[in-house]
């Protein structure tokens, strides 16, 4: 993916989550405490849970902070804040993976985008294509959401705007056939990346999940390694529902990555920590705005600082 200047402001984009967390922790970080006792750490754990970090991640973080306090004497609000950022960074680091093309990457690299309706999947598909394009790579898009005519039109509109070919058929067409045509086109043109936009679906919808399986089989027949990436798009504003969606798709489909979108408009961005803690799936990128350049590589340390309110990365 293309790099982004720090002036683009992840710190500012996560202000709603940071404000919600900071409001809850203001008494802890206000300098009123000479010593941080059990009551303070209990309150910290409650506030982390309320920020959608999840029970498991919140308990682990606070348990570690308690232990650190016993051995290193955390006695100031700033020391506690720094220790909190460090612990969140440690959890998030395991999910950090930038999606890049290597010299030995398959050609085309096939990326299948999946998710439920309304999470911004088609827009994220276009933004990802723009990122690869900005990095000097050729891209083809496959409009395999054939259940919604608007989805085909939306992707075609993005393709026209970006100058990226979109392989599509009519509304109601066989999505697997579209995927086949898209792969054949990408391979014949020597394209670097093929990104497939699939229909939004609930994991409990047997027919749509079967369709997704058919798309995967068709791609695998064309290239035994395809799809090389299966990326789930989730809406960060849904909080713990994003976690349940990710767990279900990981079990049903198998994922190589998760993209958390709409983080600029929610106070529930802490769910990224829960995803990193509870699922063995990377988070290659996050969505922090509506602009074409607002799909960012996920960077654990920067994200942790932006969540809690450490030194600005702007």
Segments (PLM) and residue ranges:
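Non-catalytic terminal/linker segments enriched in charged/polar, low-complexity residues
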Residues: 1-100, 104-113, 128, 134, ...
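P-loop/Walker A NTP-binding module and the surrounding RecA-like catalytic core of P-loop NTPases
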Residues: 85, 89-314
């Amino acid at each position: 993916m293309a790099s982004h200047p720090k002036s683009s402001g992840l710190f500012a984009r996560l202000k709603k989550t940071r404000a919600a967390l900071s409001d809850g922790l203001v008494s802890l970080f206000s300098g009123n405490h000479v010593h941080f006792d059990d009551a303070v750490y209990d309150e910290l754990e409650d506030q982390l849970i309320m920020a959608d970090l999840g029970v498991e991640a919140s308990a682990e973080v606070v348990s570690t902070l308690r232990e650190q306090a016993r051995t290193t004497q955390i006695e100031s609000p700033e020391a506690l804040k720094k220790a909190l950022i460090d612990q969140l960074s440690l959890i998030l680091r395991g999910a950090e993976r930038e999606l890049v093309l290597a010299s030995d990457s398959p050609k085309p690299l096939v990326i299948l985008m999946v998710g439920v309706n309304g999470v911004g999947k088609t827009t994220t598909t276009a933004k990802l294509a723009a990122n690869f394009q900005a990095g000097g790579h050729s891209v083809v898009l496959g409009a395999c959401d054939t259940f919604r005519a608007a989805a085909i039109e939306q992707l075609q509109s993005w393709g026209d705007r970006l100058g990226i070919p979109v392989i599509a058929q009519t509304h109601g067409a066989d999505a697997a056939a579209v995927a086949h045509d898209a792969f054949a086109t990408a391979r014949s043109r020597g394209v670097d990346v093929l990104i497939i936009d699939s229909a939004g679906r609930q994991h409990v919808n047997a027919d749509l999940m079967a369709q997704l399986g058919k798309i995967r089989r068709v791609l695998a027949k064309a290239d035994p390694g395809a799809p090389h990436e299966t990326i789930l798009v989730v809406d960060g504003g849904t909080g713990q529902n994003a976690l349940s969606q990710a767990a279900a798709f990981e079990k049903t489909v198998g994922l190589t990555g998760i993209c958390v979108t709409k983080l600029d408009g929610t106070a529930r961005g802490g769910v990224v920590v829960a995803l990193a803690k509870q699922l063995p799936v990377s988070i290659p990128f996050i969505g922090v705005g509506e602009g074409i350049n607002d799909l960012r590589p996920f960077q654990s340390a920067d994200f942790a600082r932006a969540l809690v309110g450490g030194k600005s990365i702007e």
